[in-house]
A protein has these predicted regions:
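Acidic, serine/threonine-rich low-complexity disordered tracts
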Residues: 1-10, 49-149
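Short, surface-exposed linear segments at secondary-structure transitions and domain or protein termini
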Residues: 15-21, 34-39, 75, 129
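Hydrophobic, aromatic-enriched interface-forming segments
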Residues: 22-70
């Protein structure tokens, strides 16, 4: 896109605070964002993740997120059936907007929406790759599938 801007922030690990453009925001320990949650689901076991709530920040607003193991399914990639843990990802807003980190865009606006249904299929053995993901909102479903094993 054509956006360019300046980010001015400082994180202080001694008290877990973030100073952003002069605003002081306390940051809970081990806070997640959408990208660290995706990394977590590809690295940790379904037993560990299932139903556990994680503190989450999304675009300066506090949320909490959890993975719910929905099923174990085969996902076809090329000619191969890959056994996958099928998760639903719940995200709930738990606080007010503290800061606006960047201009809004469609993905970031809607990925944490309470109206979205988020699903992720993770390879059960081996690399624990995310082989399929879908987001449904406002009657539209977007699906991403790994093309080649």
């Amino acid at each position: 896109g054509s956006y360019s801007g300046i980010l001015n922030c400082k994180y202080d690990s001694t008290d877990s605070s973030l100073t952003y453009n002069g605003n002081l925001v306390s940051v809970p320990d081990s806070i997640q964002n959408i990208f660290t949650l995706l990394a977590r689901v590809s690295r940790q076991s379904s037993d560990y993740l299932d139903t556990k709530w994680f503190p989450m920040d999304h675009e300066g607003t506090r949320h909490r997120a959890r993975f719910l193991l929905a099923d174990i399914e085969k996902v076809k990639i090329g000619n191969e059936d890959i056994l996958c843990d099928h998760f639903r990802l719940d995200i709930e807003q738990s606080g007010e907007a503290l800061i606006q980190v960047s201009p809004y865009d469609y993905f970031m606006d809607h990925v944490a929406s309470a109206k979205a249904l988020r699903q992720i299929w993770v390879e059960q053995t081996g690399k624990r790759r995310i082989v399929k993901a879908s987001v449904s909102i406002y009657g539209m479903t977007v699906i991403a599938v790994l093309q080649d094993n």
